[in-house]
From Swiss-Prot:
The modification Phosphothreonine is found at T12. The modification Phosphoserine is found at S44. It holds the Pfam family Globin. This is Hemoglobin subunit beta. The modification N6-acetyllysine is found at K59, K82, K144. Belongs to the globin family. Involved in oxygen transport from the lung to the various peripheral tissues. Coiled coil: none annotated. The keyword Cytoplasm does not apply. It comes from the Eukaryota. It comes from Chlorocebus aethiops. Heme b binds at H63, H92. GO terms for biological process: hydrogen peroxide catabolic process. Keywords: Acetylation, Heme, Iron, Metal-binding, Oxygen transport, Phosphoprotein, S-nitrosylation, Transport.
Length: 146
């Protein structure tokens, strides 16, 4: 991902304020509610029968935290996202058979959640930088599919 020095600063500064546990669970939960067909990858998570059930599900929250932990690793290696996400790309492609379009959806949901949490601090410039990052991460996760 090519980010200007200002964009890198904007991304890392905001990310330093992110509560990964809270934002991760909310982002994954919103993905499952807004795009219900994605729930098929999480059938082992128990009750996903309603938006409240999804958002309160401890397995959704725990996996969301794990997902955002991996995203944090990507932020530390913006110049090598494909390498950073190679194993996760392989896992999601070969073993889990996740449609790579879902990575884009999750990235966009994450941007919405960040905007919700940070309000005015999440300026258009910060959003533009994050859109680049989530697109780069989605591309890296889809790399094994090509």
């Amino acid at each position: 991902v090519h980010l200007t020095p200002e964009e890198k600063t904007a991304v890392t500064t905001l990310w330093g304020k992110v509560n990964v546990d809270e934002v991760g669970g909310e982002a994954l939960g919103r993905l499952l509610v807004v795009y219900p067909w994605t729930q098929r990858f999480f059938e082992s998570f128990g009750d996903l029968s309603s938006p409240d059930a999804v958002m309160g599900n401890p397995k959704v929250k725990a996996h969301g935290k794990k997902v955002l932990g991996a995203f944090s690793d990507g932020l530390a290696h913006l110049d090598n996202l494909k390498g950073t996400f190679a194993q996760l790309s392989e896992l999601h492609c070969d073993k889990l058979h996740v449609d790579p379009e879902n990575f884009k959806l999750l990235g966009n949901v994450l941007v919405c959640v960040l905007a919700h949490h940070f309000g005015k601090e999440f300026t258009p410039q910060v959003q533009a930088a994050y859109q680049k990052v989530v697109a780069g991460v989605a591309n890296a996760l889809a790399h094994k599919y090509h």
